[in-house]
Every structure is written in C-alpha cells, then in structure tokens.
C-alpha cells in the first residue's frame, strides 16, 4: 500500500517561518528552563518514535493496527517533510543561541522548519482518529506530546511545531486511507 503519491509536496503550501529567530530562541530558552523530569522522559521516548504516546494510547484502548503500518506512514512522510525543511532552510534554535540547553537526540540533524516530529505525530493522530473518531481529542493530545516535546527539548521553535502540525493536517487530507490489510493482501 502506498499512503502518499510521489510529488505530493508540490500541492501543499506552508507559510514561511517568522523572521525573528533570536526572539523566538529566547522563548525556547524559557520553555526549556521549565521542562520537567516527566517531559524529559517523554522527549526521550519520542525521539526515534514520533508517535510513541499515540501507540501507547492505542495499546491501552485496544485499538489494533497492523505491524509496520505507522512506520510506513512515517517513512513515506519523510520526503515531503524534507522538501519543506530544505526549502525554508531554518537554523535550529541552538544554532542561533548556543546557550540553549538541548537534550541528546539521534533525530535532530535536519533543519528546523517545520518540525518533522510535529507533522508525523499529528499525521498519525489524524490517521488513527479517522478510524476511531470517538478518540480524536485524546489522540491529538497524544500527538501534541510528541510534537511539542521537541520544543521543550530545545530542538525547535514554537512556530516550527505549529507549522509541523499544519503540515501533518494537510498531509492527512491527501493521504490514501484505504484499508491497510486489504491493500497489502
């Protein structure tokens, strides 16, 4: 099954990032200074699995998906997200202000805008909510945990997070939502 057609990024638009990176980096410093031990644990859990909180929610509620289904969505989203990161070419907050206390990460090696984790976690949240609409509010909240955690980690500006959510919403609109099992038989 293919979730996204090739070239989809040409049909999606995003607003440019704000111009004041230094001002927004100051916001990030305040957010980072107020992160809790619980935030740090969540950030670590989401580093290589942007949908970690969503997966945990699905497990708790018995919402079953096929092995590899979420991973395939994430994998197919990468070229679209990368297109926008290359286009906007925004430096990460720590590149603007070296005093930001970032956490360790294996996944913060690309440009900042939009946040890929925010886009991917919103996309997965919407995908699951499309199948289980009664859980949409909780799924969006779980997705936001993964996305906003990247701001709390010092990896992204708040505007990166907002644009990532917007990109995730737009990608969901265009995504193939056919039954995964039937498509893979």
Per-region residue spans from a language model:
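Hydrophobic alpha-helical bundle signature of multipass membrane enzymes
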Residues: 1-153, 170, 174
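Alpha-helical transmembrane segments that form the membrane-embedded catalytic/substrate-binding core
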Residues: 117-121, 156-185
